[in-house]
Amino acid sequence: MAETNSPRYSRILLKLSGEALSGNKDMGIDAQVLDQMSLSIAHLVGLGVQVGIVVGGGNLYRGSQLQKDGLVGRVTGDQMGMLATVMNGLAMRDALVRRNIKTRLMSALSIGTVVEPYSSRDAIRYLSQGEVCVFVAGTGNPFFTTDTAACLRGIEIEANLILKATKVDGVYNKDPSKYDDAVKYDNLTFDQVLDEKLGVMDLTAICLCRDHNVPLQVFDMNKPGALLSVIMGEKEGTHVTK
């Protein structure tokens, strides 16, 4: 256990993949998973941690097959993916509001009265007031992943830590679901991730974190208490630093 009862990190950026929101389903949002995620985030807010969230959209739209079949272009496919993140963000916002957590949904794309436009200045102000900010539509541009969007938003809001929630409990030297002898890393440097091609995030995302010296934590969001353990500075998942 950590020696202090105070959170180690005061402001974080949490990246939630669309696949994580789908739970054991092939597609869609698992209500139980969404509810549990909102509870975990509410616990952090109760401790005074300022929370920004970037959500993916892979549980609602996967464009690779449509693009492969030539039915939609890459730009259109990426834009469809951005809209999928908006739907996930709406669900996350309402799940948090249901727990009496003030939450702002901010989009990199202009979507009229549905979502307010993203502004780093406004986001920092909301976070400082104790509100959760859910960032959707990625970077607003095609060809950039939501992992890159998460690192970009984390840097912009001056987060102390960027967390990537996955379905495994950290980073391994090879796929633990395929290889019994896979070895988990407790600590890594960004250069190690790049040199060993560990696939933590895409190249652009990792380079952003490295160049701006923002640490990254990879952990299993489905493990009870894992998110809280990370925030309290306990050993959980894999910590990546410069």
Curated annotation (Swiss-Prot):
GO terms for biological process: 'de novo' CTP biosynthetic process; UDP biosynthetic process. Inhibited by UTP. InterPro entries: AceGlu_kinase-like_sf, Asp/Glu/Uridylate_kinase, Uridylate_kinase, Uridylate_kinase_bac. It is found in: Cytoplasm. One of its GO terms (molecular function) is ATP binding. Its main location: cytoplasm. GO terms for cellular component: cytosol. It comes from the Bacteria. Pfam families: AA_kinase (PF00696). UMP binds at G57, D78, T139, G140, N141, P142, F143, F144, T145, T146. Pathway: Pyrimidine metabolism; CTP biosynthesis via de novo pathway; UDP from UMP (UMPK route): step 1/1. Keywords: ATP-binding, Cytoplasm, Kinase, Nucleotide-binding, Pyrimidine biosynthesis, Transferase. Belongs to the UMP kinase family. Homohexamer. Catalyzes the reversible phosphorylation of UMP to UDP. This is Uridylate kinase.
